[in-house]
Design a protein with these regions (language model features):
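N-terminal regulatory/sensing modules of transcriptional regulators
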Residues: 1-28
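A broadly conserved detector of short glycine/acidic/proline-rich loop/turn motifs that flank catalytic sites
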Residues: 9, 22, 48, 83, ...
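Short, structured patches in soluble enzyme cores that scaffold and shape functional sites
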Residues: 20-22, 126, 134
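Phosphate- and divalent-cation-binding pockets in alpha/beta enzyme and binding domains
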Residues: 26, 139-140
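Conserved binding/recognition cores within well-folded domains
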Residues: 28-125, 129
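Short hydrophobic/aromatic patches at helix-to-coil boundaries
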Residues: 141-146
């Protein structure tokens, strides 16, 4: 993919033109990302205090007991989004759903343990251990290039 920037003093508003011979998943992803105006931050609630959580600080987003939580360096925060809404809001190249109840930040993964039959054990850099569901194993192996 080539990127070209032209500076024009007459231009009052940035304009993006995508030139391609056919529509591909890559082109659709670029268009979606450019047109997405949703905020990329998530509000986390803990002890009657609301904090803005940057996606780069989030290790994982998970559902437990009917509630959704985001785990960061500073602990766990309740978030008022459904898991699929959090998945849509977070960058799909960085955050991957590994089960019906867990989305992980690939940049925060310390190791993948493939010795388990039918699943993958993931250790995050903060020490949290989580498991890939059988349904998601193929997707994770593809991400790892296996």
């Amino acid at each position: 993919m080539q990127i070209e920037i032209k500076i024009d003093e007459k231009c009052k508003e940035p304009k993006i033109i995508v030139m391609t011979d056919k529509m591909t998943d890559e082109v659709n992803a670029i268009i979606k990302r450019l047109s997405d105006e949703q905020p990329q931050v998530i509000a986390g609630f803990r002890d009657d205090v609301v904090e803005v959580l940057e996606p780069s600080e989030i290790y994982r987003v998970f559902a437990e007991s009917g509630k959704v939580f985001a785990e960061t360096n500073h602990g766990e925060y309740a978030i008022r989004l459904r898991l699929y809404e959090a998945e849509q809001r977070l960058d799909s190249k960085t955050f991957v759903r590994i089960s019906n109840s867990d989305i992980i930040n690939l940049k925060k993964v310390k190791s993948f343990d493939l010795s388990f039959v039918g699943t993958i054990c993931i250790t995050l850099s903060n020490g949290t251990v989580t498991y890939v569901s059988r349904r998601s194993v193929a997707k994770i192996k593809q991400l790892l290039g296996m």
